[in-house]
From Swiss-Prot:
This is Digeranylgeranylglyceryl phosphate synthase. The chain crosses the membrane at residues 14-34, 38-58, 95-115, 149-169, 207-227, 235-255, 259-279. The lineage of its organism: Archaea, Methanobacteriati, Methanobacteriota, Stenosarchaea group, Methanomicrobia. PANTHER family: CHLOROPHYLL SYNTHASE, CHLOROPHYLL SYNTHASE, CHLOROPLASTIC. It is an enzyme of class 2 (transferase). It is found in: Cell membrane.
Amino acid sequence: MKTYLELMRAGNCAMAAFAGLIGVLIAYNILSSASPYVSLSLFDTSLIFAIVFLVTGAGNGLNDYFDIEIDKVNKPSRPIPSGKISLKSALYFSLFLFITGITLAFLVNPLCGIIALFNSMVLILYAQSLKRTPFFGNASVGYLTGSTFLFGGAVFGMAGLQALVVLFLLATLATIAREIVKDVEDIVGDKKDGARTLPILIGAKKASYIAAAFGFTAMLASPVPYLQSILNEQYLFVVAIADIFFLIAVYQILGKKDAARSSKLFKFAMLFALISFIVGA
C-alpha cells in the first residue's frame, strides 16, 4: 500500500484535496451570507476531499506510467522504474482511481461529476502528450489548479460555481505565469532532454514577457471580488500583499532575469492570494 501511495504522491494529493475543501468553505461563506437557506453537508464535503485526492493520485500515477523512460534516468527510485510496481499494474491502478473518483463525484451532484470527468480527461491528455506541448502544458496545469477550488464550490451547484469563478481565474492565471517561469528556469536542462517548452520555442525573453502578462492580469483582476461585493475589506488588505509579490516576481523575471527567484515569488503570491479569499469570505 505504501508503494501505491508513493506512486500517487500522497502528499501532493492531500494538498490538492485541501484546496478543494477550501473551495467548499469559501463558496459556503459567500452563499450563506446572502441566503440563510444554504446548508453545508459534511458528507458531501468529505466526498470532495476524497474525490480530489483520488483523481489527483490517478493523474500522478498515469504521469509516471508515461514517463517511465525518463524516470529510469532521472528518478530511478520511483515505484515503476525501481520495479516495485509493474507498468501494467500502475496503469490499471490509475484507471481504477479515475473511475472511483468520477463515480463518487456523480454521487455528490451531476455538476461535480461532469467536472471530475472533464478534469480526468485533461489529466490523461496532459500525461500522454499535453505536457510536452508548448504553452498548452502550462495552461493545463493552470486550469487544473484553478478548477480544484471550482470543484469545491460545485458542491453547491451552479451558484457555488459562480461564487468561485474569480478565484478560479486568479489561480489559473497565476499558475500559468509560474509554470512558464519554471520552464525559463529549466531551459538548459530541457534543451538537453529534447523538450519543446515555450521558452525553447520562442526564446526565454519572449516567454518571460508572456509570463509577466499573465502575472499582471492576475494582479489587475485581484480587486474584482471586493468591487463586486463578493468579499470584504480584509480580502483587499491581504490580496494587496499578494499583488506586491506578483510585482516583485515580474520584476525578477524581466528586470533581473532571475527565473528561480521569480518562481518562488509567484508561489508566495499565490499563497497570499489563497489566504485573502479565506479571510475575506
